[in-house]
Amino acid sequence: MISRAASRFAFTIATFVTVLVTFGLAPAAAADLKVISAGAVRGLISQIIDDYSRQTGQKFDFTIGTTGQLRNIIASGQHADLIIVSAPLMGELEKTGKLTPGSRAELGRVGIGVTIRDGAPAPDVSTPDALKKALIEARSVAYTNPAEGGTSGIYFASVAERFGIGDEIKKKAVLTRGGREAAIEVAEGRAELAIVFISEAVAVKGVKLAGPLPPALQDYSAYAAAIPSSSTDPTAARAFITALTSAAMAERWRSNGFEPPTR
């Protein structure tokens, strides 16, 4: 049975595509649209991509990674028609002239949270002291390997050092290539906690959010979309950006842990 929420969303996509067609903005739907995207938005995009493809005929070829991985991928010259990356990386690309002027669109910002397995008792992580206690008591903690350039992993490692438990955390760390993979480690019982972007936690079955990092420690990452100057299908890329930033998508972003963009 299709839920009311799913039905409403399918309707909004259909309505949105009708508007695109009416104003001559719908993509021609020929070659795959090549997208380089941050893992933090992976869950949301996976929820809408099938409906969007069915309504428009547009197919996609995604390359997903951490900020560090994507920085290297883009520097290597890999072709992309659309990029969805963190605001700092987007700023770097703007400065080097790799983006189509005026194509940047702010998508939202997301914080970091503590993820546990479904059914497990949720530790108190509401204050810095409570979070430190939960980390010390955990048998294992999964997070993105800082060496992979994952924003949440780099930040969490700095928090552990600030707490004075950096070495202790390293001894029981389960390091992964991305936040989604860290949440999967928890879902499959190989780690007790995962410290990942909230958007990555809510997208993985078998886990739940114990809570966001305490306000005094929270670190938000903003994400944006833009069209590279080398894009071979800017019309299709612009249509998808318009879909992502439409009013119909606002609740979808919120339900995936994102807050509205501040810029």
Task: Locate predicted features.
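Bacterial N-terminal signal peptides
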Residues: 10-24
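Exported/periplasmic ABC-transporter solute-binding proteins
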Residues: 27-76, 87-97, 101-110, 116-263
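Periplasmic-binding protein-like
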Residues: 81-84
